[in-house]
Amino acid sequence: MLKSKYIYFFWLLVLFISCRHDVELPPISLQECEPLPNAVAAGCSYTYNNEIYIFGGRLLDGKHTNQHWRYTPQSDTWTKLESAPLKARVSCSACVVDECVYIGLGYSGYIHRDSSYLCDFWKYNLITHEWKRLADYPANTTVKNCFVKGDGCIYALYGFNRQFTQDVYRYDIEKDQWDKMDVYAPASVPRAMDVVGASCQGRHFIGTGFNHGSLRFWAEWNPEKQQFLPRKQKLGMGRIAASCCATDEYVYLIGGRHYGDTLTTGFFYSSIQRYTPQEDKWQYVGDMPYEAEKTVVECVGGTIYVGMGDYPKGIIQNYWYKIEE
């Protein structure tokens, strides 16, 4: 009898250690940086030459903006750039290829109006500061698409209009042409809206979002096979309106909201989760100082910068932090 008790406690300890392997909290530190002069949520961000750019979003007064900002980590300063020719919008997408950023899509206007889903697509030269309008996106699923850089092309994954999608469109940079791809996805990779993604170690990851409930799914986009491959789900409950970025080794998932079945079962996240592609493993690694959705997060030189976003009561913030492990 005593021996069986020891065996029981041994396996209980093994189970505890295996669980801790996923939820342990390696030490991270957050340092407050210079806040963005204008608080914004649902902005579009990208990096170039060790600087962070933020375009568009929603301001404190609820209006959409087309302001374009550049953050320089070395001096911890923000610079407002010249006005962009794009219409003010939220939830647009961007992808940097060489010295240009390809940016557009998004949403602006009244809810569920076709004219509110924006299909315009632009190229901005980060050296000459010239804008050029390119071929329009060929679908109206233009809310929060995930852009992925390919070989001479850009892939636009998912997106939303009035239905959940799983679409992939390929933009040929030389031809200035969009084409819809035939894509395979297993049942464990659902149609969804408000997904997030990032590229790490030459691989492309995407997940979370919403489809009749907040989602935990995580998948890898394989452009050669034109497939979504299921990966280990994120920890905890599902979330929408999260933010995502990658260092050389990890993908980070930050903030967001869990939308429950009723207005009383939803809540916001402050948690930071880290995904290791080589091990297909998630870990909790810390928390932001506040709960928020639709934040901005980017990585420069191995340092993660995160901030802005919507508070639980709909208040937009301009906080800006850097995270170093």
Spans of model-derived segments:
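Bacterial Sec-dependent N-terminal signal peptides
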Residues: M1-P27
